[in-house]
Regions:
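Short hydrophobic alpha-helices and adjacent helix-cap/hinge residues
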Residues: 1-402
Length: 402
């Protein structure tokens, strides 16, 4: 099931124009009754009301037929010329637009935290979204890709490097990368493909009016993490302790941990934070979890955990631990996955890029909040670790991996 993006204000989630094109059909003697052409717009067109009528011309009986015939011929001739002119203009417009688009070479910068192979599904999704809107690599599009290879400290330099490439827009995701891009430029537009909480992270002023040079989409990670913990408790109801695997280097982790702690207290769970800053920390983290006798693990959303989902899922399976995290985590072998489709969000980022390239200020484009969340249960993993998933949870699942 795909992602549904709900605009906070002003635009349709699909990105399609809500207005309609209305041609002047009541022009007489060169004077339009209600205006010539209304172009497409993202705001509804004004109510045009009913068709405007205009008074009949009174003529004397003498010579009326001849006068009407003469005037009718003149008007019909004028209408024909206007019709041909409008038709020619409409037929020619796509060609002109295409020529302009072809002439302009668009340069998009992509700033990624993980390596290029790990990030490939996201960049492919962005390319597909841009292609749908007429931006094609090798024709009118250049994508400048920069990867920090999982090292947050490299992000600032890579962002500056993209600015040096004279990119028209930067597309990125994750609080550390977004902050690096914001520090590198106050003028080049930045599109957030996905982030846990754009407002709490101090990335935008508000969802309706982001401000500055930033716009994009958010999915509110704190609420997701709390729900993941709840689902984990439902799956292993006798568990009293849960290890929370998180990246302490992520500056946006605070609100998520607060939400998890509140959910843990409500569920009467003892939570223990286990920090992982790099992939090399994974084995040590799980050794610590086993020593402390935790039987369940919550994997908190972070670029380090998202792009190393399989390694984490393998360790949880190896130690027969019930675990929950984001969708990709369950797909990689974790027990439970709940969240948004991040790949779909990267494809949606093309919509924001297109609006910016058409002249709209990034800070004036409302942020979108992901409103569609999927539940994925890995039944194969449940059988392997000896966990019986509650039938009601299976019925609620959007997808069950057998």
């Amino acid at each position: 099931m795909g992602i549904e993006a709900a605009a906070v204000g002003g635009t349709s989630p699909s990105g399609s124009p809500e207005g309609t094109i209305t041609l002047c059909t009541g022009c007489v003697e060169g004077r339009p009754l209600r205006g010539d052409v209304h172009g497409s717009t993202n705001l509804p067109l004004p109510d045009r009301g009913g068709a405007q009528s205009w008074p009949a011309q009174r003529t004397q009986e003498h010579g009326a037929a001849a006068i009407r015939a003469s005037r009718g011929n003149a008007v019909r001739g004028l209408h024909r010329r206007q019709f041909l002119a409008v038709t020619a203009a409409l037929l020619g417009a796509p060609a002109v637009t295409s020529a302009v688009q072809a002439a302009k070479q668009v340069r998009i910068g992509v700033l990624a935290i993980p390596s290029a192979p790990q990030f490939a599904p996201r960049t492919q999704a962005l390319r597909a979204g841009l292609r749908d809107l007429g931006y094609i690599e090798g024709k009118n599009l250049i994508i400048e890709f920069r990867s920090a290879e999982g090292q947050y400290e490299r992000l600032a330099g890579l962002a500056v490097e993209l600015i040096g490439e004279k990119v028209d827009v930067i597309v990125t995701a994750g609080t550390p990368a977004i902050r690096a891009a914001k520090q590198a430029t106050k003028t080049v537009p930045i599109v957030i493909a996905a982030v846990g909480d754009a407002v709490a992270g101090g990335l935008v002023a508000s969802l309706t009016t982001p401000g500055g040079n930033v716009t994009g989409a958010t999915y509110f990670a704190p609420e997701l993490a709390a729900k993941q913990l709840e689902l984990l408790k439902q799956s292993v109801p006798h568990t009293s302790g849960v290890a929370v695997v998180m990246n302490p280097n992520n500056p946006a982790m605070g609100p998520t941990l607060h939400a998890v702690e509140a959910a843990g207290a409500s569920l009467k769970l003892d939570l223990e934070q286990v920090g992982v800053r790099h992939r090399d920390d994974f084995h040590g983290a799980f050794d610590m979890i086993i020593r402390r006798r935790s039987r369940a693990v919550l994997i908190v959303d972070d670029p380090i955990t998202i792009y190393n989902a399989r390694a984490l899922a393998d360790l949880a399976l190896q130690h027969r631990l019930a675990s929950a995290g984001f969708i990709e985590y369950a797909e990689a072998g974790g027990l439970i996955g709940y969240g948004v489709n991040l790949t779909a969000m990267w494809r949606r980022a093309a919509y924001f890029v297109d609006r910016i390239l058409r002249g709209v200020n990034a800070g004036e484009i409302p942020m979108e909040r992901a409103m569609k969340f999927d539940l994925v249960i890995n039944r194969k993993t449940a059988i392997a670790i000896g966990v019986a998933i509650d039938p009601s949870t299976l019925l609620r699942a959007d997808r069950v991996i057998e």
